[in-house]
Amino acid sequence: MLENQDELGLTDDALRREVAFFLLAGAHTTATAFVRAIDHIIGWLETHPEDADLIASDRLFVQRCIHETLRLNPSSPIGRRRALAPVRLRSGIDIPEGAVVVIDLQQVNRDPVVFGDDAGEFNPRRPLPPGVAPFGLSFAAGMHVCIGQDLAAGVVPTPGTSPDDHLSGLLTGSVQQVLNIGVRRDPVNPPERDKNTARPYWGRYPVLFGKEA
């Protein structure tokens, strides 16, 4: 950005905001998704213990768990855009030039018409309609898609994908590694939500490692 600051017409204030955003997008979002994935998978295994071997050995299944976590918990619950020109949506709604459009990503990702009657629940075995991303719109789409999507969540596998040469993402590898060394909730020190925000963040998530005595 510094090399092209003049060409792009970026002010110093715009540069500062972009740098701050990169720190948020590149670290905070991944750390938050990491804890949420651990929580969802631990909860899933409590009711589906038969999947424990898959968590340990099948990286593609773990990646599916990551995608399901991200679907339920987009880093930002909304997306906001300003219309640069008049546009008519497929539904027939007209959006005038200059209008601010707010997309409720969390509700879109939990639409039962798209994701089934249990759309609000964690289910890594969820069947998906053709053309629907397993993580919904959590990474946005089109020209605004998150540039860190493949790095964090990996490439969406297709039938016949081999885990040996598949980019499964940083979250998949780190979550599987922690689960394989026996991460579990601390029974005497339960996790707590962050009371300083309305968003569903964990404020504390104490864990233990190794098998229970």
Predicted regions and their residues:
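A structural signal for well-ordered alpha-helical segments within the folded catalytic domains
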Residues: 32, 60-63, 133, 137, ...
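Conserved cytochrome P450 K-helix E-x-x-R motif and the immediately C-terminal K′/meander segment
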Residues: 53-93
